[in-house]
């Protein structure tokens, strides 16, 4: 009898909650109710709210009023249409409701609350991916593309594709990011020099605009929305499906890390390699810095060589690591040794410091996962990450190196995290898309991927970032920030430069009430 009574009470409480309108906040701080008639799967429990309030950056904490866990794209569209001009249902009122903010959230890997919606509604895109029919990843019959739910992680796209012997051609270093999240920024990594960023490898999108309109777009169908959304920081619509280009998947990878003590040789070899388009060229290229005032990670190298690698870093204070990979399978096996031999003979690295591993294709692409596991075990993953990612014009990279790397980083008492340093080709980017790059044929991707672990204050690392930006400003180095977070309109206008007027026009066209992605702080 007691158990029956308890079950009845739980049923009644659940029914009561489901029949209670959800209270959120409008732009003006006014209470707005989401009416039951919208039939939305809305979560307001403390765990859901807390999970949506912070991100990988672990610097901001902005509570939404509610989290939408949609089972269909029509739920998202209903939410946005209501936000544009529904009714408040507050004390029987039938006057138009005040607008409220809406943000799509994938894996929450933003750095400064870009996927937050303070007081508004965060749309959990993972829910949408889990409900996708017939599946979150559908490979075409001919294997040339995949239709992917935007909340799907790239690692799941990879798994589904390689099962069919195909693969996307360009990747981020970390695969546990949502497809919609990277396409809203650019999606860059070691294949970008050859295939462009991930946004350059999309055939078609399904998007729900800020007005709640469900639209399919491509270079020929609704092209303004297509090009605007790709790299558009979530300002024009929520991507719900992406058609991703696929190619033949290799099975194995020759993965090399090659050490340089001379920056000029490092720079020369990197730029030569990204210019090679024949079969002897590499499929992946990145660069990293190993500095004596930071943690020197020697885990990639054979145990017998780790001591001399560490000694090389200590002797020179800084070592430049060229990281390249060449893919192969049974059909291309004969050329692999030729490529490795050419690299060993023609590159200007420190003699005896070229190291090669032979690994499965999946393991190579998923390589950062092992680093994540290590950091999690040490309690150093869920810490503040005041990262700085910038694109530096190739013509000024020597000045940047001398002023920032030698002048700032090497003079720090200690450095934390990874420093990325590698060039890419601008002609692999589509200028019609919203993403901004320096106006030069070759520009460098610089990533100061710092972590504030232990007693370190993230503000100290942020101050270093500010010094880097200030040095570039004072030196006339026209950088473009990536994954940036500006809080002043003039900074956004400067960032977009000649694209600003078009960006603003598209905002008015697709999200006139400025509801979407308020955490970017572009139109707030």
From Swiss-Prot:
GO molecular function: cytokinin dehydrogenase activity; FAD binding; primary methylamine oxidase activity
One annotated GO biological process: cytokinin catabolic process
Residues that, per the record, bind FAD: 104, 106, 108, 110, 114, 173, 178, 184, 188, 239, 482, 517, 520
Reactions mediated catalytically: N(6)-dimethylallyladenine + A + H2O = 3-methyl-2-butenal + adenine + AH2
Span of the signal peptide: 1-26
Source organism superkingdom: Eukaryota
Keywords noted in UniProt: FAD, Flavoprotein, Glycoprotein, Oxidoreductase, Secreted, Signal
Subcellular localization: Secreted, Extracellular space
Cofactor needs: FAD
Pfam name, any one: Cytokin-bind
Modified residues annotated as Pros-8alpha-FAD histidine in this record: 109
Tissue specificity comment: Expressed in trichomes and in developing stomata of young growing leaves. Strong expression in stipules and in the root cap, but not detected in the root meristem.
EC identifiers of the protein: 1.5.99.12
Alphabetized InterPro entries for the sequence: Cytok_DH_C_sf, Cytokinin_DH_FAD/cytokin-bd, FAD-bd_PCMH, FAD-bd_PCMH-like_sf, FAD-bd_PCMH_sub1, FAD-bd_PCMH_sub2, FAD-linked_Oxase-like_C, FAD-linked_Oxidoreductases_BP
Domain FAD-binding PCMH-type stretches: 60-249
Coiled coil: none
Transmembrane segments: none
Gene Ontology, cellular component aspect: extracellular region
Keyword NAD: no
Known role: Catalyzes the oxidation of cytokinins, a family of N(6)-substituted adenine derivatives that are plant hormones, where the substituent is an isopentenyl group.
Family: Belongs to the oxygen-dependent FAD-linked oxidoreductase family.
Protein name (record): Cytokinin dehydrogenase 4
Gene (name only): CKX4
């Amino acid at each position: 009898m007691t158990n029956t009574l308890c079950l009845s009470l739980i049923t009644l409480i659940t029914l009561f909650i489901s029949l209670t309108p959800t209270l959120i906040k409008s732009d003006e701080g006014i209470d707005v109710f989401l009416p039951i008639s919208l039939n939305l799967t809305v979560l307001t429990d403390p765990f859901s709210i807390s999970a949506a309030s912070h991100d990988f950056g672990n610097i901001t904490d902005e509570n939404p009023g509610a989290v939408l866990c949609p089972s269909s794209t029509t739920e998202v569209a209903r939410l946005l249409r209501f936000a544009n001009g529904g009714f408040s249902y507050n004390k029987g009122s039938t006057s138009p409701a005040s607008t409220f903010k809406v943000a799509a959230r994938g894996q929450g890997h933003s750095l400064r609350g870009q996927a937050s919606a303070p007081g508004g509604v965060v749309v959990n895109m993972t829910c949408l991916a889990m409900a996708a029919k017939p599946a979150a990843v559908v490979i075409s019959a001919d294997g040339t593309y995949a239709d992917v739910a935007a909340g799907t992680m790239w690692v799941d796209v990879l798994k589904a594709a390689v099962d069919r012997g195909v693969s996307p051609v360009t990747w981020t270093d970390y695969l546990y990011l949502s497809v919609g999240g990277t396409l809203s920024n650019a999606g860059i990594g070691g294949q970008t020099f050859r295939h462009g960023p991930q946004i350059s490898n999309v055939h078609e999108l399904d998007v729900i605009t800020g007005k709640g309109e469900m639209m399919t777009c491509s270079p020929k169908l609704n092209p303004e929305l297509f090009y605007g959304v790709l790299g558009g920081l979530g300002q024009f619509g929520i991507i719900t499906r992406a058609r991703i280009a696929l190619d033949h998947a290799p099975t194995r990878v020759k993965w090399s890390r090659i050490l340089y003590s001379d920056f000029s040789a490092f720079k020369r070899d990197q730029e030569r390699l990204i210019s090679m388009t024949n079969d002897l060229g590499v499929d992946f290229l990145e660069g990293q810095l190993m500095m004596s005032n930071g943690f020197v990670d020697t885990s990639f190298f054979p145990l017998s060589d780790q001591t001399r690698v560490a000694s090389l870093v200590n002797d020179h204070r800084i070592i430049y690591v060229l990281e390249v990979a060449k893919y192969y399978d049974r059909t291309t096996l004969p050329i692999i040794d030729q490529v490795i031999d050419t690299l060993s003979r023609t590159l200007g690295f420190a003699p005896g410091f070229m190291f090669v591993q032979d690994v499965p294709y999946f393991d190579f692409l998923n390589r950062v996962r092992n680093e994540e596991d290590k950091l999690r075990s040490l309690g150093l993953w869920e810490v503040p990450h005041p990262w700085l990612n910038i694109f530096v014009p190739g013509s000024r990279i020597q000045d940047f190196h001398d002023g920032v790397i030698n002048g700032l980083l090497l003079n720090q008492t200690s450095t934390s995290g990874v420093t990325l340093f590698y060039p890419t080709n601008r002609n692999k980017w589509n200028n019609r898309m919203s993403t901004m790059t320096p106006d030069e044929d070759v520009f460098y991707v610089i990533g100061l991927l710092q972590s504030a672990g232990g007693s370190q204050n993230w503000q100290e690392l942020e101050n270093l970032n500010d010094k880097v930006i200030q040095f570039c400003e004072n030196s006339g180095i026209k950088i473009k920030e990536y994954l940036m977070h500006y809080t002043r309109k003039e900074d956004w206008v400067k960032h977009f430069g000649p694209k600003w007027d078009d960006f603003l026009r598209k905002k008015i066209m697709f999200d006139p009430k400025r509801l979407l992605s308020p955490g970017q702080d572009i139109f707030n």
